[in-house]
Amino acid sequence: MSTNPRFDPNFTPYVINSMGPKTPERARVILGSLIRHIHDFAREVELTPAEWMLGVEFINSIGKISTPIRNECHRICDVIGLESLVDEIANRIVTEQGLSPTSNVILGPFWSPNAPFRELGDSIIQDPNPNGKVTFMHGVLRDMETGAPIAGAVLDIWQASANGQYDFQDPNQSENNLRGKFRSNEKGEFYWYCYHPTPYSLPTDGPAGVLLNLMDRSPMRPAHIHLMITHPDYATVINQIYPSDDPHLDIDSVFAVKDDLVVDFKPKTDDPKAELDLEYNVKMALKKHHPNPNSAPPVSSFERYNKAGKEKL
């Protein structure tokens, strides 16, 4: 707390202590810390009434533009790095031997629980785009400690098309285009056809765009493929896979790039169905190593898609 003698040192504790005895303990911890930090923030920058009201109006604008499938507050949390930080806190795994699994990153708003199961070797490309570069993606799931292959894991993949839009953003794409679920085989192997990913901009027509512009930051996301891997015995892996030559890796608008998720796409000459090859191997941690072993991924905007219809996120 600020020690500036101009400010009443008893005010913040008074506000925090106003919480009644029926306040749940975890709520008391979170709200007490929030009040303490936001009061300290106001003192530190000597927030003016006009600046405070500008902030209130900005928060109001977040609610006004949000819809059942456009979660602008989620996007604001992304562009200030809060979701990435919460994800890191929730999923940090390091064993006593210093081993760690493949990195987790944010789920993002475009995951769908409705992606269909497909057979290994199938393509998730349902609506071909003339600019899409078909990629044969393959790899092996292994236990991070023993190196043993992990059979029977579900790999859920989704990506934007070559125009930078996901299926439910684009009326020209059918539902579940560039989405699919696969099961690893007895050798822990997985393989399918997808596209080399395409970079795209976050929507800038709302408060997130205003905030990015105010901070003189790019709205671009580097090209990426989303992957979520689940298994009854292992901690869930949610990540995004980035081409190493993408120019936006260092300026990702949601701070989700991690070194072990940056990969090389290579030319493929032995398969008439693909022009690129991507090998991507994954290390998974048993649930006993996970700080939140039974945590589920957050609800995505897409879960309300079928009721709300197609609308720009």
Swiss-Prot record:
Record-annotated disulphide pairs? none
Induction data: Expression is up-regulated in the presence of benzoate.
Q: How is the cofactor bound?
A: Binds 1 Fe(3+) ion per subunit.
Q: Which cofactor does it need?
A: Fe(3+)
What processes in GO biological process is this protein linked to? catabolic process; catechol-containing compound metabolic process
Keyword vocabulary terms for this entry: Aromatic hydrocarbons catabolism, Dioxygenase, Iron, Metal-binding, Oxidoreductase
Quote the catalytic activity from the record: 3,4-dihydroxybenzoate + O2 = 3-carboxy-cis,cis-muconate + 2 H(+)
Which residues participate in Fe cation binding? 166, 200, 224, 226
Outline the segment boundaries, as ranges, of region: Disordered. 287-313
- Presence of keyword Iron: yes
- List the biased-composition ranges (Basic and acidic residues): 304-313
SUPFAM superfamilies reported in the protein's UniProt record: Aromatic compound dioxygenase
Q: What is its EC number?
A: 1.13.11.3
Per its record, what are the GO molecular function terms?
A: catechol 1,2-dioxygenase activity; dioxygenase activity; ferric iron binding
Which Gene3D superfamilies does UniProt cross-reference here?
Aromatic compound dioxygenase
Family annotation (Pfam families): Dioxygenase_C (PF00775), Dioxygenase_N (PF04444)
Q: Indicate the family of this protein.
A: Belongs to the intradiol ring-cleavage dioxygenase family.
Tell me how this protein assembles. Answer: Homodimer.
Its biological purpose is as follows: Intradiol ring-cleavage dioxygenase; part of the benzoic acid degradation pathway also known as the protocatechuic acid pathway. Benzoic acid debradation begins with the conversion of benzoic acid into 4-hydroxybenzoic acid through hydroxylation by the benzoate-4-monooxygenase bphA, and its partner NADPH-cytochrome P450 reductase cprA which act as a mediator in electron donation from NADPH. 4-Hydroxybenzoic acid is then converted into 3,4-dihydroxybenzoic acid (also called protocatechuic acid) by the p-hydroxybenzoate-m-hydroxylase phhA.
Protein name as it appears in the record: Intradiol ring-cleavage dioxygenase prcA
